[in-house]
């Protein structure tokens, strides 16, 4: 039986029993990209909602559903997939880097006897990997925010990026290379908050459900705990996310940026748009979180199975 094989065994019958790390990282990035194809419209709506009513202007969209129907009406079906190339590049850079860093740190901190890191150490590894991946993925994030925001502007104010690579080249040429990392601090902070909130809230939610006496440790309990965790994670990370979105989309006015820093964004949003505007786009953000995670793991499992069938069997 495979379970009785020694932990250090790397080969069986002359063939590797598992796929190489490089293949795992590649599949992680591809799985995230595959999931993005399905949830990109939700990302677009979330970004539009976060920019709606900026600077005490009248809100363009009353609700997320209103935003979606308005985009479909004015920009067509193709419009809800604006920025897809940037979304795909974000996954290729962020997910691959995060997975790579997590795997390396996890293996480094695993005991000589094979004992895995404890809960707190795993949480720290996850937050470190998330923050590093967010830094690497920030240029794609900047391009994504700008591309998804373009359709809400008058024609003469649009940036008109053709695709993510055109966006990156133009941003670097017109505004300088450092602009590609504009908003990297809130982007990294969001990654840390998301990782921390997911870990803490999932464990607590699962324990609460089990203690209630109405649930057993099965897939229904896991699903409900995941939904609660997603709710907590969305609520915790959205104020940081709107800071990121506003900073990455801002323009220079008379040689000065619209916002001085993240705190300035928070204060202006609360002052001119109301406290609860920090959670604009809550519905599409929450609706995106679950499906993206589920689809990512489905694609990842299928690619791993295909690789084993083609290269590791026999």
Swiss-Prot record:
Membrane-crossing residue ranges in chain numbering: 24-42, 83-101, 119-140, 183-202, 222-240, 281-300
Superkingdom of the source species: Eukaryota
GO molecular function list: oxoglutarate:malate antiporter activity
Modified residues (N6-succinyllysine): 57
Subcellular compartments: Mitochondrion inner membrane
Residues where N6-acetyllysine is found: 73, 256
Reaction(s) this enzyme catalyzes, per UniProt: (S)-malate(in) + 2-oxoglutarate(out) = (S)-malate(out) + 2-oxoglutarate(in); malonate(in) + 2-oxoglutarate(out) = malonate(out) + 2-oxoglutarate(in); succinate(in) + 2-oxoglutarate(out) = succinate(out) + 2-oxoglutarate(in); maleate(in) + 2-oxoglutarate(out) = maleate(out) + 2-oxoglutarate(in)
Solcar repeats: 23-108, 117-208, 217-306
InterPro entries per UniProt: Mito_Metabolite_Transporter (IPR050391), Mitochondrial_sb/sol_carrier (IPR018108), Mt_carrier_dom_sf (IPR023395)
Residues found modified as N-acetylalanine: 2
GO cellular component, one term: mitochondrial inner membrane
UniProt keyword terms in alphabetical order: Acetylation, Antiport, Lipid transport, Membrane, Mitochondrion, Mitochondrion inner membrane, Phosphoprotein, Repeat, Transmembrane, Transmembrane helix, Transport
Post-translational modification Phosphotyrosine, affected residues: 102
Any one biological process term the GO annotation gives: lipid transport
Pfam families: Mito_carr
Quaternary structure and partners: Interacts with SMIM26.
Role summary: Catalyzes the transport of 2-oxoglutarate (alpha-oxoglutarate) across the inner mitochondrial membrane in an electroneutral exchange for malate. Can also exchange 2-oxoglutarate for other dicarboxylic acids such as malonate, succinate, maleate and oxaloacetate, although with lower affinity. Contributes to several metabolic processes, including the malate-aspartate shuttle, the oxoglutarate/isocitrate shuttle, in gluconeogenesis from lactate, and in nitrogen metabolism. Maintains mitochondrial fusion and fission events, and the organization and morphology of cristae.
Protein name: Mitochondrial 2-oxoglutarate/malate carrier protein
Taxonomic source organism: Mus musculus
Gene this protein is translated from: Slc25a11
């Amino acid at each position: 039986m495979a379970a009785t094989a020694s932990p250090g065994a790397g080969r069986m019958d002359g063939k590797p029993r598992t796929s190489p790390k490089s293949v795992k990282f590649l599949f992680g990035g591809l799985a995230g990209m595959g999931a993005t194809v399905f949830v990109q419209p939700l990302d677009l709506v979330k970004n539009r909602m976060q920019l709606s009513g900026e600077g005490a202007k009248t809100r363009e969209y009353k609700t997320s559903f209103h935003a979606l129907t308005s985009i479909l009406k004015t920009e067509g079906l193709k419009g809800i997939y604006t920025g897809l190339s940037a979304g795909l590049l974000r996954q290729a850079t962020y997910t691959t880097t995060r997975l790579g860093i997590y795997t390396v740190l996890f293996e480094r901190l695993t005991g000589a006897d094979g004992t895995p890191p404890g809960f707190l150490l795993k949480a720290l590894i996850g937050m470190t990997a998330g923050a590093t991946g967010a830094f690497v993925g920030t240029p794609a994030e900047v391009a994504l925010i700008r591309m998804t925001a373009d359709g809400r502007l008058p024609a003469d104010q649009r940036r008109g990026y053709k695709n993510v690579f055109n966006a990156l080249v133009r941003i670097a040429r017109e505004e300088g290379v450092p602009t590609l990392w504009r908003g990297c601090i809130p982007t990294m902070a969001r990654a840390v908050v998301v990782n921390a909130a997911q870990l803490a809230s999932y464990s607590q939610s699962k324990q609460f459900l089990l203690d209630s006496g109405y649930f057993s440790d099965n897939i229904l309990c896991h699903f409900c705990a995941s939904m609660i965790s997603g709710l907590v994670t969305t609520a915790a990370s959205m104020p940081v996310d709107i800071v990121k979105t506003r900073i990455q989309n801002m323009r220079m006015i008379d040689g000065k940026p619209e916002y001085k820093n993240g705190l300035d964004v928070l204060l202006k949003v609360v002052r001119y748009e109301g406290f609860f505007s920090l959670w604009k786009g809550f519905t599409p953000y929450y609706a995106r979180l679950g499906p993206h995670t589920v689809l990512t793991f489905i694609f990842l499992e299928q690619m791993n199975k295909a690789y084993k069938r083609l290269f590791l069997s026999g």
